[in-house]
């Protein structure tokens, strides 16, 4: 593949996530009905984001914890020039201690354990077992896009970085699927088909399979993204991202459909956005969405620095 195409998709992955996250905040935690009420004509721009008690905590055009935590991983890759799990965990904890706005309850509980930074995976396992192994939130899949941009060992790195906070095999499988999809798009110009994704999912947890089926064979509505009791489930987010990957004809179309579905929309759109950015490249992300990001120039500098590691 030409280097220019790789670079476009590489940058598209990171910007695709940040844009999806920032736009998805507009409908986060809303039911689809509420989305219709607040945005009767849809949403096209950050300036339209309603300023209720939840959303006014962020300035329009800012991303949330999804991209913050992804950038903790990216910063670690660049600073260490390698994958260092303890360094990533330290950066997560530092981010949490310095505000950590939007942090999920599960992620907070894991990182609040006293010895988190010395043995993060053990902390994640303890909290998972304390919850009777039921918790499978989307707080790891939301940040895994950047792992797909590593040149090698994507599977093991996605597994281990996931387990810094999320130990459940559904979370681990979600992360490996997303990172593998991005890696294949960026570096191999290859689409993972249904059989490929099922093959990966089976290695982790059979419960992933039904969501792969919904994403491949059914409409986006079949995923019930705004389900009040389980909107933060890792498999709903994975399903939304896979639906966009296989069915969206453009970055914009895929993101808007997911955003207008409500639920945990910033996370769903962040993960789908990373995949669509990897598929279509940074130039296919609407210019006003990229330039409208509050920290667009900082993000651009970070991605360029990460990309330069491969030169």
Regions flagged by a language model, labelled:
Residues 1-311:
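Structured, active/binding-site neighborhoods that engage oxygen-rich ligands
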């Amino acid at each position: 593949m030409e280097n220019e195409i790789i670079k476009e998709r590489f940058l598209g992955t990171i910007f695709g996530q940040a844009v999806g996250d920032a736009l998805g905040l507009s409908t986060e935690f809303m039911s689809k009905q509420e989305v219709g009420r607040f945005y009767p004509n849809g949403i096209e721009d950050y300036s339209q984001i309603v300023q209720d008690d939840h959303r006014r905590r962020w300035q329009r055009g800012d991303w949330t914890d999804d991209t913050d935590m992804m950038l903790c991983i990216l910063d670690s890759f660049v600073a260490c020039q390698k994958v260092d799990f303890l360094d990533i965990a330290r950066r997560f904890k530092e981010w949490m201690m310095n505000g950590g706005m939007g942090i999920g309850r599960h992620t907070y509980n894991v990182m609040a354990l006293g010895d988190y930074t010395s043995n993060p995976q053990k902390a994640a396992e303890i909290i998972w077992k304390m919850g009777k192994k039921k918790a499978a939130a989307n707080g790891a899949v939301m940040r895994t896009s950047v792992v797909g941009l590593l040149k090698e060992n994507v599977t093991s790195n996605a597994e281990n970085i996931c387990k810094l906070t999320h130990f459940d095999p559904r979370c681990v499988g979600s992360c490996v699927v997303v990172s593998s999809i991005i890696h294949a798009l960026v570096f191999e110009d290859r689409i993972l088909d249904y059989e490929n994704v099922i093959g990966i999912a089976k290695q982790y947890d059979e419960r992933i399979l039904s969501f792969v089926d919904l994403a491949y064979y059914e409409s986006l509505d079949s995923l019930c993204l705004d389900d009040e009791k389980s909107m933060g489930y890792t498999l709903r987010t994975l399903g939304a991202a896979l639906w966009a990957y296989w069915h969206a004809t453009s970055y914009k179309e895929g993101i808007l459909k997911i955003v207008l579905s409500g639920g945990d929309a910033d996370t769903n759109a962040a993960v789908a956005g990373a995949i669509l950015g990897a598929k279509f490249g940074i130039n296919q992300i609407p210019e006003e969405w990229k330039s409208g990001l509050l920290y667009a120039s900082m993000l651009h500098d970070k991605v360029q620095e990460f990309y330069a590691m491969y030169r």
